[in-house]
Swiss-Prot record:
Disulfide bonds: none annotated. It holds the Pfam family zf-LITAF-like. Its main location: host cell. Zn(2+) binds at C21, C24, C71, C74. This is Uncharacterized protein 075L. The keyword Metal-binding applies. Residues 39-61 are annotated as: Membrane-binding amphipathic helix. SMART domains: LITAF (SM00714). GO terms for cellular component: host cell membrane; membrane. It is a peripheral membrane protein. The keyword Ribonucleoprotein does not apply. Keywords: Host membrane, Membrane, Metal-binding, Zinc.
Amino acid sequence: MDDKFTTLPCELEDYPGSITCPHCSAQITTAVDHVVGKMSWVVCTAITLACLPCCCIPFLCNSTKDVRHTCPKCKQAVFVYKIL
């Protein structure tokens, strides 16, 4: 596994950021994609205990998902901001 994820600035959170892509060396603004992560499952479990029909809500809300930053030029993942 490439260790390039750890060398990126920590300013990348849930919004696009300007960086130099560690894969293609282009100066880019990252593309963001919200993906299901641990926080989505934790909130789903908590909601299931209270109201079973509402358990899918965390999978529809971006605020509970991890954020994957990708390079729009080479399409490689450059950073994943994990909520939990």
